[in-house]
């Protein structure tokens, strides 16, 4: 990945609220299925905004930090997704999204970020991201002191 897009906690919450507003009325949903691990924080934010208490997970592994690898389903939520929102942080090349669609064909699949290759596979997303850009999520970063450029 040649570029990086840094996401702050504030930005993530703003984007999640925007996405939640598109999922109203909340009463239409039985629950949320968060895609582990990237969808866990967005899933919690959507659950808060929509007042949803039933939150489950589907655990899929496809990355080692910034290296994509073979898809592995570790754990899945039951059912076909009817009445559920499935949420992930990002749709990238679409590998995970294809697996999600197969597991939960009746769910509404949403992400905060979407790259061009994966956009057609999700029902909704908030932010367009170029395909060659790596997203640095706030849960992967720490706040550190950075000395001034002048050194004083």
Curated annotation (Swiss-Prot):
Pathway: Purine metabolism; GMP biosynthesis via salvage pathway; GMP from guanine: step 1/1; Purine metabolism; XMP biosynthesis via salvage pathway; XMP from xanthine: step 1/1. It is found in: Cell inner membrane. Its cofactor is Mg(2+). Its main location: membrane. CDD domains: PRTases_typeI (cd06223). 5-phospho-alpha-D-ribose 1-diphosphate binds at residues 37-38, 69, 88-96. Xanthine binds at residues 92, 135. One of its GO terms (molecular function) is hypoxanthine phosphoribosyltransferase activity. It comes from the Bacteria. It catalyses: GMP + diphosphate = guanine + 5-phospho-alpha-D-ribose 1-diphosphate; XMP + diphosphate = xanthine + 5-phospho-alpha-D-ribose 1-diphosphate; IMP + diphosphate = hypoxanthine + 5-phospho-alpha-D-ribose 1-diphosphate. GMP binds at residues 69, 92-96, 134-135. Mg(2+) binds at residue 89. It is an enzyme of class 2 (transferase). Belongs to the purine/pyrimidine phosphoribosyltransferase family. XGPT subfamily. Purine salvage pathway enzyme that catalyzes the transfer of the ribosyl-5-phosphate group from 5-phospho-alpha-D-ribose 1-diphosphate (PRPP) to the N9 position of the 6-oxopurines guanine and xanthine to form the corresponding ribonucleotides GMP (guanosine 5'-monophosphate) and XMP (xanthosine 5'-monophosphate), with the release of PPi. To a lesser extent, also acts on hypoxanthine. This is Xanthine-guanine phosphoribosyltransferase. It comes from Cronobacter sakazakii (strain ATCC BAA-894). The lineage of its organism: Bacteria, Pseudomonadati, Pseudomonadota, Gammaproteobacteria, Enterobacterales.
């Amino acid at each position: 990945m040649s570029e990086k897009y840094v996401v702050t906690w504030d930005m993530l919450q703003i984007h999640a609220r925007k996405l939640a507003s598109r999922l109203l009325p909340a009463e239409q949903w039985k629950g949320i299925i968060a895609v582990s691990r990237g969808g866990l924080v967005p899933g919690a934010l959507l659950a808060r905004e929509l007042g949803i208490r039933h939150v489950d997970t589907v655990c899929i592994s496809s990355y080692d930090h910034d290296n994509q690898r073979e898809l592995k389903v570790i754990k899945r939520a039951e059912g076909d997704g009817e009445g559920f929102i499935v949420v992930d942080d990002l749709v990238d090349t679409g590998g995970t999204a294809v697996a999600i669609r197969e597991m939960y064909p009746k769910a509404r699949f949403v992400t905060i970020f979407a790259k061009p290759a994966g956009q057609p596979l999700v029902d909704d997303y908030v932010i367009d991201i170029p395909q060659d850009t790596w997203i640095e999520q706030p849960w992967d970063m720490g706040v550190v002191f950075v000395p001034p450029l002048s050194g004083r």
